[in-house]
Amino acid sequence: MSGRSAVKHVPKPWGHETIWAHTDQYVGKILHIRAGEALSVQYHNVKDETVYLLSGELIYRVWENDVPTDVELKIGEAFRITPHTIHQMEAVTDCDILEVSTPHLEDVVRLTDRYGREGTSAP
């Protein structure tokens, strides 16, 4: 149905997410990651996502054949993560990131996590 969408604020140990769109077809979020913080090393079985850096400096770490590569995203650049790609975001400075994805929010397999959330999809 067309109209205003509910906006949800989700606190995270690394900052917060603002979910501004959540439908059965797609999800839109803004992630705020504090300087020096990082999301878990993770992958998704189904979820397909693309991020766009709105502000700050971000390292997007991506593993291919068990080898990590650091991609330094600059403001205005986008990066896509397809299912089964191991990845991690780390903020060099405070960052705001626009993320659009398929609606599979619980599809998170955390391999390592500095906040003790390995193996879960907990916020």
Where on the chain are the PLM-derived regions?
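Short beta-strand His + acidic residue motifs that chelate non-heme Fe in jelly-roll/DSBH
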Residues: 40-42, 60-61, 81, 86-92, ...
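Glycine- and acidic-residue-biased ligand/ion/polar-headgroup-sensing regions
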Residues: 46-64
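Short, surface-exposed secondary-structure edge patches
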Residues: 30, 50, 70-71
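Cytosolic regulatory regions built on CNB/CRP/Popeye-like sensor folds
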Residues: 1-9, 69, 75-76
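Double-stranded beta-helix
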Residues: 4-6, 10-11, 90-123
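A short glycine-rich, His/Asp/Glu-containing loop-to-beta-strand
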Residues: 5-42, 46-47
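Short acidic-glycine-tyrosine-enriched beta hairpin
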Residues: 64-84
